[in-house]
């Protein structure tokens, strides 16, 4: 999937390929940055803008981000790791909690 955001400093459109897990009506993405201590720019941009667009196959969908927390995050984390085991490996490289973000269709 490709996530499109607007750069918080540049104002330019940015496109980033991201892995996703389908969870109900949401597409869940992991802001891992391969385990780096820095939060990925796409998440900073999306959080500041409050919305973005994703391209899944031939569909373009306007989305709003929602940071997963608590028990919901824990449950979805293990589903994400099952889909992409490398995600668990990333936690060894950083002290930050890797954000899991539900991208929800705008207007729902």
Give each language-model segment a name.
Residues 1-32:
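Short beta-strand segments
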Residues 24-25, 106-108:
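Short loop segments at secondary-structure junctions
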Residues 32-87, 92-99, 105-107:
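Short, structured beta-strand-loop surface elements
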């Amino acid at each position: 999937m490709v996530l499109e955001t607007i750069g918080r400093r540049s104002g330019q459109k940015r496109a980033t390929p991201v892995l996703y897990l389908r969870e109900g009506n949401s597409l869940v993405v992991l802001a891992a940055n391969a385990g780096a201590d820095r939060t990925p720019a796409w998440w900073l941009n999306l959080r500041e803008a409050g919305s973005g667009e994703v391209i899944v196959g031939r569909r373009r969908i306007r989305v709003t981000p929602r940071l997963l927390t608590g028990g919901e995050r824990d449950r979805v984390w293990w589903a994400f790791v099952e889909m992409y085991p490398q995600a668990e490996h990333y936690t060894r490289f950083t002290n930050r909690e890797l954000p899991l973000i539900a991208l929800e269709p705008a207007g729902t």
